[in-house]
Amino acid sequence: VNLLFNLVKQTSSALKETDYDIEIAETHHKHKKDAPSGTALSLGDYAALGRKTSLNKSKILDRTKKLSSRKKGEIGFSVTRGGEIAGEHTVSFIGENDRVDLVHKANNRSIFVKGALDAALFLSKKKSGFYTMNDLLFNK
């Protein structure tokens, strides 16, 4: 997922706001309570960063409350809950003539355990300090 964050920011920066709308769709198991998920909101943050704005200014969580056409710069969210899906996130950049989708699908929850263990191993070899998942991904 951390790689996806970086890809979303880069893609958002590269594709013009006037030419591409951004939609974030996420699916999780039926037991998940928050909607949208923290991961989906983080993806929105990275998309907004790529456009040099804030998610608070651009997020649309519910299109059912007022009837209006889409405004430039909006970042829309859609949420699905069902079954035992560990997590699926799609960030779509939708233009007039094409669509670019960036997708991450967790087949099961073990991928999150692996990420935590990889991070712990990485940190065990480092001096005390502040590190992010980007340090793990890009500075091995």
Identify the role of each PLM range:
Residues 1-21:
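A contiguous active-site-proximal alpha/beta segment in oxidoreductase catalytic domains
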Residues 19-140:
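C-terminal substrate-binding/catalytic lobe of Rossmann-fold NAD(P)-dependent oxidoreductases
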